[in-house]
UniProtKB/Swiss-Prot annotation:
A lipid is attached at residues 603, 829 (S-palmitoyl cysteine). Disulfide bonds join 75-323, 732-787. This is Glutamate receptor 1. It comes from Macaca fascicularis (Crab-eating macaque). Residues 863-872 have a biased composition (Low complexity). The gene is GRIA1. Ionotropic glutamate receptor that functions as a ligand-gated cation channel, gated by L-glutamate and glutamatergic agonists such as alpha-amino-3-hydroxy-5-methyl-4-isoxazolepropionic acid (AMPA), quisqualic acid, and kainic acid. L-glutamate acts as an excitatory neurotransmitter at many synapses in the central nervous system.
Length: 906
């Protein structure tokens, strides 16, 4: 029951509060002129409201510059019970209005110029302009200009400009023209002409601005070289017809984009509305203040509808309040209305309508418009997040493909291999046919896709483009575009920030980075024993120790294992046989077995015991892995001749002083090092700018020649694409080392706001998608290369081994053969000496002993007696020592007869 009771109570209270919300909301209006376009916009906006509550206007026509009259009308409307007031103010009355609004908690919605106030009850419909103005001045790189302003608008914009000028060292001459007469204008512009001041900012309302521009035309200060920035949100509200053919540039801001869907729809409804109330409206160019007025009415309607949905009671009961009471009594419901107004957000005539906690517009967009001799066009837009964003020429520029096609454009470029080169027989051709190269073909493809005629012209100073730090003037191809001497630049022109500020670039047609060029070092010849390189010397030592260790272990296990011993039978006499235990794995046979297994040649003996076979098996496995690994690496080590480079990276350059290094004297590479904040590059820049003699060169060709003649003592820093190209040209003595120091791209450049920018950009993207850009690079870099290797089309070729690669193997073979001959000779001498000594002893024994020896020598070689008396052989069994055949005929003297006795005679 308690829950049901609470539910009904809540519903009842909500119904009571909802019922108390007024169906009619009184709103005030303070206008300077009943016939003004703003007044008509106010009434039209009210007529378009259909949802409750209904807004009932209390409109007063007032002199907005008269503080007394403004106070009287404001208090009069407040006493009549208005919930909010819409109106205008001027510099003389703004402080009074903000003071009353803050004291009485009455919301004042205004399209007048923004003021810097903390009063949250003043809702400012007009966006602030100072940040956008500073962005445009910075965009044009103005360092010295005149600021003409109207003091009636307040000084907030001027103050912001002066503060920024102090930070950026701008030279600003501020001129107040509030009371300037026609003669004053003449003297003003004469004085500016004497000082060569042709860059002017004009900060005035539209009415006064039209008068100033009229004086500019009358005094003929609208010729080529003059540039005016209009600090006004209604560029399209101003009559600029007489500026179209004058040659002067005029830049300004447009708050309302009447080509958008919502503004176009509202303007059509307004045009078709009651002609009796809106006959004085200029439908061709409605003013931006009228659009702000329309949005202001909608802001109030949205706020009161929100309060109604929330069932917030804002009804004014009893006394409506005394405006001049002392002390002032604030209206209790004013806070609720103020919060509701600041929370409104919608898409209106002036774009996104939204307010911050101070009642100022936020998240808005301003369109930047420029007028030159060829018409009006949008050059970009500005918002609080992105600041100024340049845009390609759109429909407002009045430029189209037909205008592009109806003239011959000047394409500036630079002689640089392989981008632009004179043909060998260039004197036999004329015009563009004299040149060949990557950029020559690229320019032809771009012209074919865009559909224009062009003429190639080589830049006179032979430079890419940099700004002089003293005169601030641009040279090279960038200067040609900035000063209107060329229409397009098709060259290896790097896209950089400082260049992008004064010219426009297409999407990159080639990606690259700064690289290091050095003279190619001599290839290192392989050593005599380079066949040992696949394995480290530590591994070879371990293999030797493993070989000896395995041989010793095999010898030991063969001795200890009873299964390694076996019996051999032999005849001792005609009717008697004898058996003996033998073991084939003595120490030398063990070494021989291990060596044969390691060389994968095998041996005529094998282990018989399980322990011996385990030793042999693990040794075979070991040699299998080692030999396989060695063989896998041997080919690479024998066929590759390494070049030992003195440097491998920028870090190596920075930490040494023996090798000098430099860049192009005027170009993006030098600018990169000058602006870099990376420690290594800062160190390199410090060295380069102070090196003696200078390490900078005027052209890339000069840098290449310096590298080749320096004998490895100079490194040249340049774009990787050019480095790769030079590496493919004879005499093939330069090379690129290390990776790229940065990442950037080459782009096709056009003047700021050129009608060619968008078509050229689309053409570059299309050529990239078709693969033509890669095809052109392969053609001019690698297909025409002179060093036999290069791009992706090059095929790997197997290098033939030279004698130096395998000389060590032959040395070992020859050494082994010589060692074998030497060992054989030593064995022969040793054996001969041993037998000679033995025979001398044999000749001295008695005849009976000789006969006995002869008798025993006729027995089989391996007799039991011989085995017991002779030493053990290699395989551990007894052997008899027979006389060599050469010794069997040696004569001996008998003691009894003194006659020589030969063995054959016995």
């Amino acid at each position: 029951m308690q829950h049901i009771f609470a539910f009904f109570c809540t519903g009842f209270l909500g119904a009571v509060v909802g019922a108390n919300f007024p169906n009619n909301i009184q709103i005030g209006g303070l206008f300077p002129n009943q016939q003004s376009q703003e007044h008509a916009a106010f009434r039209f906006a009210l007529s378009q409201l259909t949802e409750p509550p209904k807004l009932l206007p209390q409109i007063d026509i007032v002199n907005i510059s008269d503080s007394f009259e403004m106070t009287y009308r404001f208090c009069s409307q407040f006493s009549k019970g208005v919930y909010a007031i819409f109106g205008f103010y001027e510099r003389r009355t703004v402080n009074m209005l903000t003071s009353f609004c803050g004291a009485l908690h009455v919301c004042f919605i205004t399209p007048s110029f923004p003021v810097d106030t903390s009063n949250q009850f003043v809702l400012q419909l007009r966006p602030e302009l100072q940040d956008a103005l500073i962005s445009i001045i910075d965009h044009y790189k103005w360092q010295k200009f005149v600021y003409i302003y109207d003091a009636d608008r307040g000084l907030s914009v001027l103050q912001k400009v002066l503060d920024t000028a102090a930070e950026k060292n701008w030279q600003v001459t501020a001129v107040n023209i509030l009371t300037t007469t026609e003669e004053g204008y003449r003297m003003l512009f004469q004085d500016l002409e004497k000082k060569k001041e042709r860059l002017v900012v004009v900060d005035c309302e539209s009415e006064r601005l039209n008068a100033i521009l009229g004086q500019i035309i009358k005094l003929e200060k609208n010729g080529i070289g003059y540039h005016y920035i209009l600090a006004n949100l209604g560029f399209m509200d101003i009559d600029l017809n007489k500026f179209k053919e004058s040659g002067a540039n005029v830049t300004g801001f447009q708050l309302v984009n009447y080509t958008d869907t919502i503004p176009a729809k509202i303007m059509q409804q307004w045009k078709n509305s009651d002609a009796r109330d809106h006959t004085r409206v200029d439908w061709k160019r409605p003013k931006y203040t009228s659009a702000l007025t329309y949005d202001g009415v909608k802001v109030m309607a949205e706020a009161f509808q929100s309060l109604r949905r929330q069932r917030i009671d804002i009804s004014r009961r009893g006394n409506a309040g005394d405006c001049l009471a002392n002390p002032a009594v604030p209206w209790g419901q004013g806070i609720d209305i103020q919060r509701a107004l600041q929370q409104v957000r919608f898409e209106g005539l002036t774009g996104n309508v939204q307010f911050n906690e101070k009642g100022r517009r936020t998240n808005y967009t301003l369109h930047v418009i420029e007028m030159k001799h060829d018409g009006i066009r949008k050059i970009g837009y500005w918002n609080e997040d992105d600041k100024f964003v340049p845009a390609a020429t759109d429909a407002q520029a009045g430029g189209d493909n037909s205008s592009v096609q109806n003239r011959t454009y000047i394409v500036t470029t630079i002689l640089e291999d392989p981008y632009v080169m004179l043909k060998k027989n260039a004197n036999q051709f004329e015009g563009n046919d004299r040149y060949e190269g990557y950029c020559v073909e690229l320019a032809a493809e771009i012209a074919k896709h865009v559909g224009y005629s062009y003429r190639l012209e080589i830049v006179s100073d032979g430079k890419y483009g940099a700004r002089d730090p003293d005169t601030k003037a641009w040279n090279g191809m960038v200067g040609e575009l900035v000063y209107g001497r060329a229409d397009v630049a098709v060259a290896p022109l790097t896209i950089t920030l400082v260049r992008e500020e004064v010219i426009d670039f297409s999407k990159p047609f080639m990606s690259l980075g700064i690289s290091i060029m050095i003279k190619k070092p001599q290839k290192s010849k392989p050593g005599v024993f380079s066949f040992l390189d696949p394995l480290a010397y530590e591994i070879w030592m371990c293999i030797v120790f493993a070989y000896i260790g395995v041989s010793v272990v095999l010898f030991l296990v063969s001795r200890f294992s009873p299964y390694e011993w076996h019996s051999e039978e032999f005849e001792e006499g005609r009717d008697q046989t004898t058996s003996d235990q033998s073991n084939e794995f003595g120490i030398f046979n063990s070494l021989w077995f291990s060596l044969g297994a390691f060389m994968q040649q095998g041996c005529d003996i094998s282990p018989r015991s399980l322990s011996g076979r385990i030793v042999g098996g693990v040794w075979w496995f070991f040699t299998l892995i080692i030999i396989s690994s060695y063989t896998a690496n041997l080919a690479a080590f024998l066929t590759v001749e390494r070049m030992v480079s003195p440097i491998e990276s920028a870090e190596d350059l920075a930490k040494q002083t023996e090798i000098a290094y430099g860049t192009l004297e005027a170009g993006s590479t030098k600018e990169f090092f000058r602006r870099s904040k990376i420690a290594v590059f800062e160190k390199m820049w410090t060295y380069m700018k102070s090196a003696e003699p200078s390490v900078f060169v005027r052209t890339t060709e000069e840098g290449m020649i310096r590298v080749r003649k320096s004998k490895g003592k100079y490194a040249y820093l340049l774009e990787s694409t050019m480095n790769e190209y030079i590496e493919q040209r004879k005499p093939c003595d330069t090379m690129k080392v290390g990776g790229n120091l940065d990442s950037k791209g080459y782009g096709i450049a056009t003047p700021k706001g050129s009608a060619l920018r968008n078509p050229v950009n689309l053409a570059v993207l299309k050529l990239n998608e078709q693969g033509l850009l890669d095809k052109l690079k392969n053609k001019w870099w690698y297909d025409k290369g002179e060093c036999g290797s290069g791009g992706g089309d090059s095929k790997d070729k197997t290098s033939a081994l030279s004698l130096s690669n395998v000389a060590g193997v032959f040395y070992i073979l020859i050494g082994g053969l010589g060692l074998a001959m030497l060992v054989a000779l030593i064995e022969f001498c040793y054996k001969s000496r041993s037998e000679s000594k033995r025979m001398k002893g044999f000749c001295l024994i008695p005849q009976q002993s000789i006969n006995e020896a002869i008798r025993t020598s006729t027995l089989p070689r391996n007799s039991g007696a011989g085995a017991s008396s002779a030493g053990s052989g290699e395989n551990g069994r007894v052997v008899s020592h027979d006389f060599p055949k050469s010794m069997q005929s040696i004569p001996c003297m008998s003691h009894s007869s003194g006659m020589p006795l030969g063995a054959t005679g016995l």
